[in-house]
C-alpha cells in the first residue's frame, strides 16, 4: 500500500487548497494513478483499521442492483445514511446502473451479467466496460457516482481491472474503493476461471478534506504491516450469486482505526 501512502503525503504537502460543494474545503491534485498486484496480497490498509464488513456488504448491495439502504441497515452498515431519503431510497445510483441501465428506448441492460459473459466468451475484447455515469439519471441520484467506470482486461490467465474515479476522498473513501474493487476483481476472476491480476486505480480530483489533515499526518507516521489474504470459499455460477459468508479475510493486523468526519 506504499502507493496510497505516497499519494496521501503528496496531496497533504503539495495539493492546492480549494473550496468545494460541501463547504468544508479541500486540498487537492488532479490526475493520479495507483497500481496493486493482487497476487502480492489483498490491498487493505494496515496503517489504520478498516471495517471490512461494510466494504463487502456495500459491494454485495451494488451487485444486487439495490438502491435502498434497507439491506445495509439490516447488516449494520451506515455509510450511505446521510444521503438517503426518509424511505431509505437513493435514486438510480450504482446498483441500478450496474444491473438495470435504462436506455433511451426504455430497454434495460444488466451490465454485470453482460461483462461477465464477455469475459468468458470474448476475453480479448476492449469493451469489457461497466459505467455508472448515466447522464440522464444523474439529476435523480442522491449522490452522483464518484467511482464511475471500470474496465476489465484478460492476459496470461489473469483478470485485471482499471477504475476511473472522478472524485476521490483520499482519507475516507479511497481505501474503501481500493478494497471494494480488489474484491470485485477477485470475485469476477473466480467465476470466470481466471486468477486475479492487477487493480489499477485512476483518480481525477483526488483530495483531502481540511478536517482530515491531522488524521492523515497520524496515518503517515505509522509503519505499514504485511497485507492480508482474501479467500473465496465457495464456487458459484455468477458473480451476482455470492453471499457474505462466501469470503474470508486472514492475517489482517492493522493499526487502530482513525476517526474522521464525513463531508456530506
UniProtKB/Swiss-Prot annotation:
PROSITE patterns in the record: THYMIDYLATE_SYNTHASE
Subcellular location: Cytoplasm
E.C. number(s) listed in UniProt: 2.1.1.45
GO molecular function, one term: thymidylate synthase activity
Annotated catalysed reactions: dUMP + (6R)-5,10-methylene-5,6,7,8-tetrahydrofolate = 7,8-dihydrofolate + dTMP
Annotated pathway: Pyrimidine metabolism; dTTP biosynthesis
Binding site for (6R)-5,10-methylene-5,6,7,8-tetrahydrofolate: 51, 169, 263
GO biological process, alphabetically ordered: dTMP biosynthetic process; dTTP biosynthetic process; methylation
Binding site for dUMP: 21, 126-127, 166-169, 177, 207-209
Entry keyword set: Cytoplasm, Methyltransferase, Nucleotide biosynthesis, Transferase
Keyword Cytoplasm among UniProt keywords: yes
Role of this protein: Catalyzes the reductive methylation of 2'-deoxyuridine-5'-monophosphate (dUMP) to 2'-deoxythymidine-5'-monophosphate (dTMP) while utilizing 5,10-methylenetetrahydrofolate (mTHF) as the methyl donor and reductant in the reaction, yielding dihydrofolate (DHF) as a by-product. This enzymatic reaction provides an intracellular de novo source of dTMP, an essential precursor for DNA biosynthesis.
Subunit structure: Homodimer.
Family: Belongs to the thymidylate synthase family. Bacterial-type ThyA subfamily.
NCBIfam families reported for this sequence: PRK01827.1-3 (NF002497), PRK01827.1-5 (NF002499), thym_sym (TIGR03284)
Designated name of the protein: Thymidylate synthase
Source organism per UniProt: Rhodopirellula baltica (strain DSM 10527 / NCIMB 13988 / SH1)
